[in-house]
Each structure stands twice: as C-alpha cells, then as structure tokens.
Swiss-Prot record:
Residue numbers of Phosphoserine PTMs: S104, S122
Protein name, per record: Kappa-casein
GO-annotated biological processes: lactation; protein stabilization
Origin organism lineage: Eukaryota, Metazoa, Chordata, Craniata, Vertebrata
Tissue specificity comment: Mammary gland specific. Secreted in milk.
Length: 125
C-alpha cells in the first residue's frame, strides 16, 4: 500500500446537523434568558437552495511564493570568446581516378554511337 494523500471523508450529507462541516465553524449566539423569536419576517425572494462553499485546497500541493521583479538580472557574457559555427561536412561523390588502359579503350569504342543512313522513298501520286 502507498501513502494516501487525500483526506478521509465520511459518506454523510453536508446538511446534517449532527456532523458539522470540517472547514467552517457555525456562529454560536448564546442567549440564556433572552426571548428568541420563533417567526421571522422573510423577504419575498426565494432563498438559494444550495449554499456555495469554496473548495479546500489539497494540503500536499506546494505552491511557491511569488517572486518580486525588483532586481534585474544581467547575464554575464564573455566577449573575449568568439562563437564559431560548426563545420558541416558536405557529401561529395568520390571519383576513382585509377584507369585501366584496356578497359578505357574498349569503353570508348563501344560507347560511340553508330550512324546509319536509311533512304526513304515515298510513292505519291
């Protein structure tokens, strides 16, 4: 089992008069000998059905304090050192310069295109 970071809460409705809501204290007015009126003059407006309560923040979340911007921080820059761009190697095709004499002569003779002359005779009437 791990550490439970959440508060244990009972499954009891909030408006139960015997279990008070843990984050709020109800105002208590003690009048021992004074007469407490039973009927109050209520306004003609319907009261809200649900009392909105702010959610309590979990206690395990650490909220950092706000920092003041009074001090201006100037970063220290070293002006003596120069920044050189990185050298990027370029990929160039490598040409093999070793030439065999026999192979080059055969290549030259076989690579020359042959030109042939064809006579075209047209028979038009």
């Amino acid at each position: 089992y791990g550490i439970n970071y959440y508060q244990h809460r009972l499954a009891v409705p909030i408006n139960n008069q015997f279990i008070p809501y843990p984050n709020y204290a109800k105002p208590v007015a003690i009048r021992l000998h004074a007469q407490i009126p039973q009927c109050q003059a209520l306004p003609n407006i319907d009261p809200p059905t649900v009392e909105r309560r702010p959610r309590p923040r979990p206690s395990f979340i650490a909220i950092p304090p706000k920092k003041t911007q009074d001090k201006t921080v100037i970063p220290a820059i070293n002006t003596v050192a120069t920044v050189e761009p990185p050298v990027i190697p370029t990929a160039e095709p490598v040409v093999n310069t070793v030439v065999i004499a026999e192979a080059s002569s055969e290549f030259i003779t076989t690579s020359t295109p042959e030109t042939t002359t064809v006579q075209i005779t047209s028979t038009e009437i």
